[in-house]
Amino acid sequence: MKNGKISESVLKRSVLKQLHTTSDRILFKPAVGEDCAVISMQAGGQTKLVTATQMFMLDVSDKHVRANCAVYDALNNIYAMGAGPVGIELALLVPTTENEAVLRETVRAIDAVCEEAGIVVLGGHTQVSRAVKNIVVTVTAIGEAYEQALTPSSAAAPGMDVIVTGYVGLEGTAILANEKRAELETRFSKAFIDKSAAYIDHISPAMEAASAIGAGVAAIHDASQGGIFGALWDMAEASGIGLDIDLKKLPIRQDTIEISEFFDINPYKLLSGGSLIIIAADGTRVVRELEK
């Protein structure tokens, strides 16, 4: 199989099709574009348990970068579903080449991100294995939401407006600036690289999600994985509609464009943590609320 995220056809054929998902307590069964499980805790209860799992396994040396990406790539799915996070379950798979100090620093960095987000590490599992070359961080974010506040990707409908918050490719730009600094220094100034590297502290869309939901939206999708192109495709697939997008209107920073050109990367395929795709019947109202 090809390295990286599996294709939609493989996901449908060899993963989703194999799952038994019939349960009266499950509001949304596993599907393309739906990144959260939503569970009814009791019959007739309005509060729902919301969970989302993400795995971060990029070869990233900076503990702060790894922690931010691992935690927020999961949390952002919770925010996008209209839920408030409570905590995370953390699983670490550590290569035999690492020492205990690296493990300690990794956990400390993850806990610091959780504290910043107002959540805690609820539990998890840690294991050392020869099967991996880099630390693999798996985060399951757990949150809660009222049923009427849920904003699944599948709720988008024809004729609605599409709003994109944050900046396309911001997370990927930050990772490249932190991890490829020596290469970037052959063209860009230290100030330019430092500014791009600092974007790693701006990949949470919690405030934007809350503002949008308050204004009344139908669907929200986190753009972290697969870049904005992948996220738009997932949302269209989940809702069974087409999306008419003006590429020139997608919010993207100039340094993202320049760094992408330097590495010959499509900026619209970069990790886009901090960016949300919002579908609403009244997009103007949502934008006004976001601009407050």
State each model region's role.
Residues 1-292:
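Helix-biased detector of long, well-ordered alpha-helical tracts
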